[in-house]
Amino acid sequence: MRIVYFTHSLRSCWNHGNAHFLRGVLSELVERGHDVRVFEPEGSWSLENLLKDHGESGLQSFSANYPELSSRTYSRAEEGAAQAWGADLVIVHEWNEPELVAAVGRLRARGGRFTLLFHDTHHRAVSAPSEMRSYELDSYDGVLAFGATLARVYERWGWGERVFVWHEAADMRRFRPPEEEARREGLVWIGNWGDGERSAEIVEFLLRPGRDAGLPVDIYGVRYPDDAKRRLNQFGARYHGWLANAAAPAVFADHLATVHVPRRFYTQALPGIPTIRVFEALACGIPLVSAPWDDCEHLFRVGEDFLMVADGEAMTNALRDLANDPQLREKLVRSGLETIRKRHTCGHRADELMTIVERLRAPVLESAA
């Protein structure tokens, strides 16, 4: 099958979490023999920021770890949309300009014989609904939503049975436990400051508990304003800046535990969506403690795959327990890995995507018969 995917950027993961899952699932599809072609706009915001901060060397991790993947750029929406001709499946991610989304839809309406899907992995459907409603999706066959609560938003917008839950997942080809265990020390958090969506929570569930539990804290991520960096210094946390996503497994392997601090939209308006770092951390075999969120889809076995706490004091206690109890750490790692391998790999998501495409095509095939 020829698969065309339109993304904000395949090459850059600078403040671009969707690149993590996209690389993993497209790599899986390539491995299965599909002809995968990726297109991104010239001068994408994420790529420009990566190059500004790190130059061409910032791209080396992607090219070294994903030699089977590449992307081509386009300068105008119509030029980009034209690349969909001849495809069997076209997926357009929500972090594309509305002009590109509309142009691909027009191509489909003019006789494009491909299945056309819109892929939403963000909270804008609830945080900025007017923006999302402005996308022209009339000619799209379906929507891929990265959680059931987001899917229900699209159902209310009239998509009915044409919206499908397609969670993110771990790329087990690259995100896996170290082959040999070495000394682990301290707490690590890989994540961006959060645009004001979790600033207080980072202090309550990461910085203060890490300090109070007596654990050194290492932080990786971007978009930390000066006042955020001062806050890190106040609690003795070490800030390292951007980390290429493919380097995350090695960083996890050096640390005793990690923490998940969800953005407020994923604890209030869109519960049940863990975002990709939970999948990746568990796949790497690092014990994880999470700030509260509602796993309403039962993606994990909370309390077995990872610990979840209600407040900062409970987080401090959980981190102390992990630091002092190697059996607890081993139990969490074993359980978390089991759940990822059984349900949440990019291989599972590739299977789900093929099932979705078959389901969307089935009525056409039946009527043609």
Question: How would you name each of these model-derived features?
Answer:
Residues 18-29, 204-206, 353:
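Short amphipathic alpha-helix
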Residues 43, 147-152, 221-227, 292-295:
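Short, polar loop motifs at secondary-structure junctions
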Residues 9, 23-27, 37-154, 269:
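Extended catalytic core of nucleotide-activated donor transferases of GT-like folds
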Residues 21-24, 40-41, 229-361, 365:
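Catalytic binding pocket for nucleotide-activated donors in carbohydrate/polymer assembly enzymes
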Residues 171-257, 265:
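Conserved catalytic-core segment of nucleotide-activated headgroup transferases in glycan assembly
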